[in-house]
């Protein structure tokens, strides 16, 4: 059982959140590392992992997946505003936030947060939720509203296809970036920085930039390669349910990420890979 209180009408802006393991006979305060002077408004518990909690505060939303021992703020795309209400859409694993004066925010498929504290690897690809297979409608031969003008308002649909969530402990750096990072560290520590010889510089010049890819498989055969972002932390990328392009490789399309026909409905596997020049 969890309970959230506020006492701001008496000039007390501290965070009050309590947990009971014996149906309310005794209570334990679990505000722990929450910032000072942070009013709390709402708490919601995940329907699968009972230790995963979401906390609406006066300054954004926090989550914990260890029952309140440590709280982490959700920042990406979420402004520093008052979150007054929280709802969980169980079928889609979506987190819905009602704010004071700034509308509604939705975090699509938060299921990756259930195992966030268990990540001990340099990277991890999380299982996506099932996707819908359909052909997107093209109005007047174009996308969205085509040429119907600004008076015809339409909002963006969610990205089409399968949405992958993956985690990178650190951004993969090139040899040059790694060397420059090490040199900056030495400079701060007042250590001697050695000038790289021409072989090192030549190797850096010829190096292929590191890249992150997601390979899609069907019956152990690669049917599509999706280029992903090389960024630290949680990232998301979509596969549009298409196969690799069957076009003949030429100088015009060599660097283009062209797609082929749409794959059949079924089960597919995916693998997160990094391209590094050794």
Which ranges hold each PLM region?
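Conserved small/polar residues in nucleotide/adenosyl-binding loops
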Residues: 277-278
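Beta-propeller blade termini and top-face loops
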Residues: 1-152, 159-161, 169-171
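Glycine-centered tight-turn motifs at strand-turn-strand junctions
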Residues: 222-259
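A short tyrosine-centered beta-strand micro-motif
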Residues: 235, 266-270
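Conserved aromatic beta-strand anchor motif in extracellular beta-sandwich/beta-rich domains
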Residues: 216-218
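Contiguous beta-strand segments within globular domains
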Residues: 142-211, 236
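Conserved structural position at the C-terminal beta-strand
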Residues: 272-274
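Surface-exposed, short loops/turns at beta-strand junctions within beta-sandwich domains
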Residues: 261-264
């Amino acid at each position: 059982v969890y309970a959230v209180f506020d006492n701001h009408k008496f000039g007390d802006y501290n965070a009050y959140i309590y947990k009971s393991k014996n149906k309310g006979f005794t209570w334990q305060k679990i505000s722990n590392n929450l910032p000072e002077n942070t009013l709390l408004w709402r708490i919601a518990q995940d329907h699968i992992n009972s230790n995963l909690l979401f906390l609406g505060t006066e300054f954004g939303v926090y989550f914990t997946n260890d029952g309140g021992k440590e709280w982490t703020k959700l920042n990406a795309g979420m402004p520093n505003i008052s979150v007054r209400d929280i709802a969980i859409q169980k079928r889609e694993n979506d987190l819905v936030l009602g704010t004071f004066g700034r509308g509604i925010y939705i975090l699509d498929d938060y299921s990756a947060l259930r195992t966030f504290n268990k990540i001990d690897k340099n990277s991890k690809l999380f299982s996506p939720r099932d996707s819908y297979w359909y052909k997107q409608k093209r109005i007047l031969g174009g996308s969205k509203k085509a040429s119907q003008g600004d008076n015809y308002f339409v909002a963006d649909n969610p990205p089409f296809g399968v949405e992958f969530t993956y985690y990178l402990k650190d951004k993969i750096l090139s040899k040059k970036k790694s060397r420059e990072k090490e040199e900056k560290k030495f400079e701060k520590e007042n250590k001697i920085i050695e000038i790289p010889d021409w072989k090192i510089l030549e190797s850096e010049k010829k190096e292929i930039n590191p890249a992150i890819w997601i390979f899609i498989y069907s019956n152990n055969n690669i049917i599509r390669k999706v280029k992903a972002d090389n960024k630290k932390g949680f990232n998301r990328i979509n596969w549009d349910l298409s196969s690799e392009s069957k076009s003949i490789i030429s100088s015009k399309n060599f660097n283009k990420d062209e797609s082929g026909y749409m794959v059949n409905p079924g089960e597919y596997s995916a693998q997160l890979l990094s391209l590094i020049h050794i």
